[in-house]
Amino acid sequence: ELKKTGLYENAIIWSPSKADLSDLSISHCLSYIKKIKYGLLSYKEERRLGLSWSKRLSERSFLAVNGTLLTANLAIKSGVGCHLGGGTHHSHFDYGAGFCVFNDLAYSALMLTKNKIVKKILIFDCDVHQGDGTARILEKNDNIFTCSIHCKKNFPVNKAQSNLDVELDDHTNNIEYLHEIQKSIKFCVNSFKPDFVFYDAGIDIHKHDELGKLN
């Protein structure tokens, strides 16, 4: 699809390496990481994740998180970067959920601040579902601000507490949505003054997404 639009031809394509277990432990517990690496998930854990373990899933998961980190480092140098395999915001410290194995947003933000590449990071999450895993992993980190703009009556049922949560009613339209986006980004930037922004651009806000509930 990207080739059809012509965007692919104008892009510089990069390939990430796999994340190390030691690096991933900055955002996930080692026992869970090993379950993904070696296929040790229980049936109940696979049900919660929404995916059955396979070698390809494991390999992709270790690549995807580093894809976001690579993109972030490239964006710091060039001003912007795009990673199509990121945004896995339902993954928690010790388990995966909602088709999200590892939380690339939390992982990459923590790696950037740990290595002192940037000091303050804003995660601006516009997926139709709340970024509950991101919020919980980063809830005690004062250098990373989490903002989630999501449909109120949608997954997950039990919401987490982001630094800023904006809950949208069913059938929210373009004008209402853009108003909330503008108001929220202005508040986040003015109050937190981030050095770097992760933008999780979930496409499930589109009116043709059957489960999104927005217009």
In which residue ranges do the predicted regions lie?
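A general "terminal functional-core" signal
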Residues: 36, 43-215
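N-terminal low-complexity, Ser/Thr- and acidic-residue-enriched intrinsically disordered segments
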Residues: 1-21
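Charged, often glycine-rich, active-site loop that binds/positions anionic groups
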Residues: 17-41
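Short, conserved beta-strand segments within well-ordered enzyme catalytic domains
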Residues: 14, 25, 83
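Residue-level detector of short coil/turn "hinge" positions at structural boundaries
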Residues: 9-10, 31, 119-120
